[in-house]
C-alpha cells in the first residue's frame, strides 16, 4: 500500500483524489478554461505515474514535499505556467501558516501554557524553564531539518526510532559522564575565569565535588557521577586528620599559650612568589615544620591504621575534629547538590555517587557519613534529598554478608533505602562486568542514577569507568513495529532487525556530528581531560570513542501483547522476549566489532517518551486492550507496574532479560512504607536480586512529607500529626527521585498510580537446586 508522509511525520494512505482536488482548485483560481474536472484528473494521473517512476522502487511512502514538487513538474511540462505560479503561491501561503503554528507553539512555551512536564526536574513555569522550552521548539526543528539523514528523521517522526534530547543535537553535546574525581581533586582544574588548586582537606574536596558536578553538567545534556567516592576521599580524610593532629600538638606547646593570633592575622608579608599572606599562615607553617622535626613523623604516617604509632590524645582529638569536618562537608554537599540550579528551568545537575567498597577505615567513615547524610535529610524538615542518587556497590567478600569488612555499612545502607529510597544497589560482581580489577575501584561496576552504565571498552580502556559515559541514546518503539508488521511475529522480527540497523546508523550520524564539534564548545571538559583518552591533536573523537552508543527500546510488554496476546510474565511471552533481546544483543556485538565503537543494549528510562510515544500510537492505531488503554508504555523490559506478584517473582522474570543489556538497565520492586520496620526482609530481597545477577537494583517505598510540620511516612489525604494537606509526595521517576510525582508528565503520573506493591509475600524464596 502506498502511503504519504506529512510534514508533521504522520503517515497516511495515499489519496489521488486529494491531488486532483488541489490541481482543480489551482486551475479555477487562474480562470482556466475547458473541462476542468477532466484536466485535473489527467494531471493528477500524470503526477502519480511520475511519483511511481521516481520513488516507488525505493519506498512505498511518498513525502508530501516530493509529491508537491512533482505537481509543479507536471504543470510546467504541460505548459501551465500560470498554474505553476499560482500553485507555488499556494504552497508558500501554507508554509507561512505552518510557521505561524510553530510560532504559536513557541509562544505557548514562552508563556508556560499547556505545560506537560517533559522532565520532572525542570520547572517549566520558571523564567529559565519557559525560555529553555521555547528555544527547544526551534532547536528540535533545526536538528530534524539540518543535522540528520532523512531516514533518521522519518523514523523519529513515525514513532519508530526515537532520538533523545533532540534540542541538544545541533550544538553537539553528548549525554553523560563518570567524572575522574581522583585526578581533578589531586591536580586541580581550570575554568574559563580562573583555576582551582588541588584539594587540601575533606571540606574542600567535598565542596569541589559539587562544583565539578555543576561545571561538567554544563558541557553535556545528561547525568554526572562519581564512581567510587569513598575511595576518592581517603587521601583528603588523611590530609584533614593530619592537620587536626598537628593543631592538637600545637595547642599543647608552651609557645602557643603566649602567641597572639589576632595580631599575627593582622600582619602581612610577601612570599617568594610575590603573594601577600598573613603572618598567621607563616607562623602555622613554621609550627608544622617544628612538629615534623620534633616528632619524627612523616605525612605518610597519618593513617587511622597507624594508631599505635601516634599519640593517643592527639589521635583522638584529631579524629573527633575530622569526623566533625566530614559530617559538615557531606551535609554541605547534599545541600549544594539540591540547590545549585545550574540549568534552565531551575534544573539541578543529575548527580550520582557510588560507594561502599572501600575497607580502609577512612573510606568506611566516608561511606558512613554519606549514608547518615541521606538519613538525616536536608532543609528545615529534613526532607529526603533527591540528589545525589546514592548507589551502594554490593561486592562479594566486602559487604554482602555478616563477617565481611563492610557488612555494617550495608546494614546502614538498607536502613537508608527503607526510609529515603536511596541508595540503590550496583552489583559489582555482575557477570557483565567480568574482568574488572579488584585492586582498582575505577573498574568496579558503577552506574548513573537513571541506569546508564559503561561496558567493556573495545578501544583500549577495558572496564575502566572514570572518564567514560554514554555519548548518545536512541530508542526503538517496538509496539509501533508490531502494528506495522500486522501483529505477525516473523514480520515483526524482520522489521525489528531492519530498525536496529537503522538505529545504529542514526547513532553513528550523531556520534560523527558530536565529534565534528570544536573543543571550545565544552571548555571545562576538554581543558581538564574529564573525558578519558583525549588527544588534542586528534580531536575529540579520540575521547568520544571510549563512550557508549546506546541502542534502547520501549514497550516490550505491550509488544508481546500485540504479537501473542500475553507478556513476559508467561512462559510463552518470555520465550519471545528472549528471542527479541537476543537479536538486540547479537546486533550490538556485531556493530561493536565492525565499527570499533561501543554499541550497547540499553533499557531506556523513557521518562517522557513513555507518554509521548503512547499519544502518537493512540492517534494512529486507536485504543487496544492491554496495549494502549493506558496513558503510557511500559519502560523497556520491565514487568508492567500493574502486575501483582512478589518481589522475588518480579526479580525472577526480569533477571532472565537484564543480562542482554550492556549499556544500562535497572530492576525495581515496590514495597510498603512499613519496610523500614522490617529491614531483614529487605535484605532478603536485595541479596536475592544480587544472586540472580541483577546489575542494578532499586527499592521503591512511599515517601510523603508534611511541608508544615516535617512528618514523613506514607500519608493519605492529611498529615496525621498536624492535619495539613500541604504534602510533598516523593516518588522515583527513572532511577532518580523527584520532589513530587505531580511534577511528572500525565503519563508518568498515571503509571505511578497504577503501581502495585509487591507484597504478596515477604517470605524468603527457597532456592531450587
Language-model segment annotations:
Residues 15, 19, 472, 549-556, ...:
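Catalytic-loop motifs flanking and including active-site residues across diverse enzymes
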Residues 93-97, 103-545, 566, 570-731, ...:
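Conserved catalytic cores of very large enzyme subunits
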Residues 1-114, 750-756:
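Charged, amphipathic alpha-helical regulatory modules used
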Residues 549-562, 582, 732:
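Contiguous, well-ordered alpha-helical segments that form the cores/surfaces of helical PPI scaffolds
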Residues 6-11, 29-38, 461-465, 541-546, ...:
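A ubiquitous short alpha-helical element
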Residues 46-51, 75, 576-590, 751-764:
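Short, mixed-charge aromatic SLiMs
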Residues 717-769:
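Long insertion/accessory domains within large nucleic-acid-processing enzymes
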Amino acid at each position: 500500500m502506498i502511503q504519504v508522509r506529512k510534514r508533521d511525520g504522520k503517515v497516511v494512505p495515499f489519496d489521488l483524489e486529494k491531488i486532483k482536488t488541489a490541481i482543480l482548485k489551482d486551475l479555477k483560481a487562474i480562470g482556466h478554461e475547458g473541462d476542468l474536472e477532466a484536466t485535473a484528473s489527467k494531471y493528477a494521473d500524470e503526477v502519480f505515474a511520475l511519483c511511481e517512476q521516481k520513488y516507488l522502487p525505493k519506498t512505498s511512502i511518498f513525502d508530501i514535499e516530493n509529491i508537491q514538487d512533482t505537481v509543479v513538474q507536471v504543470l510546467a511540462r504541460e505548459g501551465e505556467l500560470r498554474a505553476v505560479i499560482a500553485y507555488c503561491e499556494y504552497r508558500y501561503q501554507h508554509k507561512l501558516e505552518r510557521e505561524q503554528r510553530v510560532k504559536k507553539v513557541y509562544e505557548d512555551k514562552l508563556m508556560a501554557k499547556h505545560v506537560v512536564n517533559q522532565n520532572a526536574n525542570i520547572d517549566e513555569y520558571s523564567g529559565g524553564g519557559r525560555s529553555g522550552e521555547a528555544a527547544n521548539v526551534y532547536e528540535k526543528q533545526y536538528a530534524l531539518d539540518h543535522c540528520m539523514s532523512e531516514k533518521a528523521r522519518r523514523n523519529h517522526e513515525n514513532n519508530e526510532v526515537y532520538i533523545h534530547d533532540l534540542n541538544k543535537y545541533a550544538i553537539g553535546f553528548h549525554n553523560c559522564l563518570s567524572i575522574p574525581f581522583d585526578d581533578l581533586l589531586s591536580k586541580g582544574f581550570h575554568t574559563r575565569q580562573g583555576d582551582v588548586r588541588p584539594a587540601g582537606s575533606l571540606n574542600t574536596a567535598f565542596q569541589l565535588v559539587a562544583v565539578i558536578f555543576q561545571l561538567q553538567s554544563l558541557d553535556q545534556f545528561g547525568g554526572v557521577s562519581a564512581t567510587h567516592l569513598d575511595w576518592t576521599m581517603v587521601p583528603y580524610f588523611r590530609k584533614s586528620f593530619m592537620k587536626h593532629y598537628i593543631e592538637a600538638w600545637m595547642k599543647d606547646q608552651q609557645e602557643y599559650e603566649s602567641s597572639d593570633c589576632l595580631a599575627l592575622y593582622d600582619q602581612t608579608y610577601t612570599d617568594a612568589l610575590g603573594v601577600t599572606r598573613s603572618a598567621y599562615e607563616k607562623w602555622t607553617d613554621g609550627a608544622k615544620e617544628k612538629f615534623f622535626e620534633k616528632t619524627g613523623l612523616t605525612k605518610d604516617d597519618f593513617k587511622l591504621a597507624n594508631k599505635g604509632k601516634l599519640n593517643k590524645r592527639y589521635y583522638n582529638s584529631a579524629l573527633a575534629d575530622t569526623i566533625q569536618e566530614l559530617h559538615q562537608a557531606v551535609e554541605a554537599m547534599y545541600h549544594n547538590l539540591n540547590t545549585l540550579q545550574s540549568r534552565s528551568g531551575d534544573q539541578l545537575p543529575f548527580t550520582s555517587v557510588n560507594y561502599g567498597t572501600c575497607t580502609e577505615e577512612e573510606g568506611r567513615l566516608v561511606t558512613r557519613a554519606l549514608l547518615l547524610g541521606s538519613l538525616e535529610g536536608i532543609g528545615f524538615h529534613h526532607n529526603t534529598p533527591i540528589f545525589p542518587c546514592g548507589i551502594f556497590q554490593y561486592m562479594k567478600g566486602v559487604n554482602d554478608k555478616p563477617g565481611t569488612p563492610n557488612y555494617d555499612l550495608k546494614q546502614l545502607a538498607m536502613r537508608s533505602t527503607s526510609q529515603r529510597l536511596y541508595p540503590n544497589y550496583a552489583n559489582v560482581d555482575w557477570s557483565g562486568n567480568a574482568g574488572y580489577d579488584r585492586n582498582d575501584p575505577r573498574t568496579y561496576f558503577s552506574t548513573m542514577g537513571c541506569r546508564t552504565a559503561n561496558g567493556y571498552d573495545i578501544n583500549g580502556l577495558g572496564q575502566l569507568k572514570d572518564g567514560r559515559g554514554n555519548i548518545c541514546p536512541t530508542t526503538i518503539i517496538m509496539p509501533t513495529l508490531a502494528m506495522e508488521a500486522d501483529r505477525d511475529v516473523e514480520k515483526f522480527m524482520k522489521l525489528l532487525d531492519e530498525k536496529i540497523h537503522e538505529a545504529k546508523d542514526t547513532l553513528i550520524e550523531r556520534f560523527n556530528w558530536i565529534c565534528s564539534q570544536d573543543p571550545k564548545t565544552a571548555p571545562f571538559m576538554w581543558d581538564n581531560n574529564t573525558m578519558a583518552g583525549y588527544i588534542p591533536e586528534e580531536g575529540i573523537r579520540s575521547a568520544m570513542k571510549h563512550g557508549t552508543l546506546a541502542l534502547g527500546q520501549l514497550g516490550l510488554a505491550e509488544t508481546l501483547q500485540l504479537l501473542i496476546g500475553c507478556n513476559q510474565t508467561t512462559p510463552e511471552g518470555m520465550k519471545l522476549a528472549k528471542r527479541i533481546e537476543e537479536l538486540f544483543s547479537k546486533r550490538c556485538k556485531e556493530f561493536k566489532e565492525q565499527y570499533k565503537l561501543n554499541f550497547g543494549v540499553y533499557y531506556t528510562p523513557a521518562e517522557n517518551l513513555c507518554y509521548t510515544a503512547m499519544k502518537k500510537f493512540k492517534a494512529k492505531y486507536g485504543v487496544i486492550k492491554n496495549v494502549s488503554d493506558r496513558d503510557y508504555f511500559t519502560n523497556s523490559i520491565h514487568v508492567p507496574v500493574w502486575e501483582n506478584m512478589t518481589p522475588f517473582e518480579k526479580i525472577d522474570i526480569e533477571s532472565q532479560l537484564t543480562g542482554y543489556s550492556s549499556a544500562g538497565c535497572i530492576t525495581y520492586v515496590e514495597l510498603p512504607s512499613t519496610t523500614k520496620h522490617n529491614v531483614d526482609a529487605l535484605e532478603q530481597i536485595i541479596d536475592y536480586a544480587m544472586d540472580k545477577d541483577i546489575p542494578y537494583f532499586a527499592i521503591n517505598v512511599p515517601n510523603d512529607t508534611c511541608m508544615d510540620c516535617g512528618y514523613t511516612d506514607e500519608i493519605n489525604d492529611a498529615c496525621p500529626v498536624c492535619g495539613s494537606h500541604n504534602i510533598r509526595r516523593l516518588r522515583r521517576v527513572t532511577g532518580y527521585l523527584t520532589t513530587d510525582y505531580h511534577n511528572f508528565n500525565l503519563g508518568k503520573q498515571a503509571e505511578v498510580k497504577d503501581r502495585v506493591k509487591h507484597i504478596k509475600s515477604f517470605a524468603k524464596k527457597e532456592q531450587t537446586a
